[in-house]
Amino acid sequence: MVDSVYRTRSLGVAAEGLPDQYADGEAARVWQLYIGDTRSRTSEYKTWLLGLLRQHGCRRVLDVACGTGVDSIMLVEEGFSVTSVDASDKMLKYALKERWNRRHEPAFDKWVIEEANWMTLDKDVPQPAGGGFDAVICLGNSFAHLPDCKGDQSEHRQALKNIASMVRTGGLLVIDHRNYDHILSTGCAPPGKNIYYKSDLTKDVTTSVLTVNNKAHMVTLDYTVQVPAAGQDGPPSLSKFRLSYYPHCLAPFTELLRAAFEGKCQHSVLGDFKPYQPGQAYVPCYFIHVLKRTA
């Protein structure tokens, strides 16, 4: 339905099933350059995530949107037992390559990587003994990739229910989304640096909002990225690609998350890794939800 009104992705990207917006391979390659490796993660993000997981005694972590594996690699290096899944085989190949290259390291030899779909996650990923993972992470605005094809958010509810089912009692779900409240009210993303990536390759990001029947239905981001030349002497080139997102606003997404846990959770919201208060002066780029299953 979404493609009948507006082209949601770069040409060549798969249109059936759970949309893989990186299926043409080129978008996945450019995205890998854009986000970089573990060294490209901001120190604030790394310190926050590792501190959160260790504070709650998390050891077994499920990354349900691992992409190229950059977060999972960081967690494996830090001693966590990691299972990494993604719906895009083009993205997973980078994670698989890293695991192969470091297979002689015991931690990487034990790293589990699987292709999986949020809509069937409970069937695609076996739970560890003890009734679930200590922590499930879905970061980098990943969940917003899932569109609302039926117009009733039933896919969102099912996917979140499946993701929540992987969290053990006392375990955490850490999931985020861009500040779509600000994007929808202003038409632009909040000013400020990316809290996750230190990439200096981004030359431009253009934001568009699609409204259907007076309701925001989709946000597209058109990236222009400077790609380094293959050789030492060649000039860099500019690559363009488009990604589309469902605009999850803070209040309704909070309701979806609590429903996924049937209300049996503790829930807190951060704005760019800091406690968030509605109406505060600072406008965050991302909202991060931390939910702890209570029963």
From Swiss-Prot:
Subunit (UniProt): Homotetramer.
Gene Ontology biological-process annotations: glycogen metabolic process; methionine metabolic process; methylation; one-carbon metabolic process; protein homotetramerization; regulation of gluconeogenesis; S-adenosylhomocysteine metabolic process; S-adenosylmethionine metabolic process
Record-linked PROSITE patterns: SAM_GNMT (PS51600)
The EC number(s) this enzyme carries: 2.1.1.20
Any one GO CC term of the record: cytosol
Keywords, in A-Z order: Cytoplasm, Folate-binding, Methyltransferase, Phosphoprotein, S-adenosyl-L-methionine, Transferase
Binding positions ((6S)-5-methyl-5,6,7,8-tetrahydrofolate 1): S4, Y6, R242
General function of this protein: Catalyzes the methylation of glycine by using S-adenosylmethionine (AdoMet) to form N-methylglycine (sarcosine) with the concomitant production of S-adenosylhomocysteine (AdoHcy), a reaction regulated by the binding of 5-methyltetrahydrofolate. Plays an important role in the regulation of methyl group metabolism by regulating the ratio between S-adenosyl-L-methionine and S-adenosyl-L-homocysteine.
Sequence positions bearing Phosphotyrosine: Y34
Species this chain originates from: Oryctolagus cuniculus
Expressing tissues: Abundant in liver.
Activity regulation text: Inhibited by 5-methyltetrahydrofolate monoglutamate and by 5-methyltetrahydrofolate pentaglutamate, inhibition is much more effective by the pentaglutamate form than by the monoglutamate form. Two molecules of 5-methyltetrahydrofolate are bound per tetramer. The binding sites are localized between subunits. Inhibitor binding may preclude movements of the polypeptide chain that are necessary for enzyme activity.
Cellular location(s): Cytoplasm
Keyword Methyltransferase: yes
Residues at which S-adenosyl-L-methionine binds: 22, 31, 34, 41, 65, 86-88, 117-118, 139-142, 178, 223
High-level lineage: Eukaryota, Metazoa, Chordata, Craniata, Vertebrata
Family membership noted in the UniProt record: Belongs to the class I-like SAM-binding methyltransferase superfamily. Glycine N-methyltransferase family.
Phosphoserine: modified positions: S10
Name listed for the protein in its UniProt record: Glycine N-methyltransferase
Keyword field contains Phosphoprotein: yes
Predominant place of localization: cytoplasm
UniProt-recorded Gene Ontology molecular function terms: folic acid binding; glycine binding; glycine N-methyltransferase activity; identical protein binding; S-adenosyl-L-methionine binding
Record field: catalytic activity: glycine + S-adenosyl-L-methionine = sarcosine + S-adenosyl-L-homocysteine + H(+)
Gene that encodes the chain: GNMT
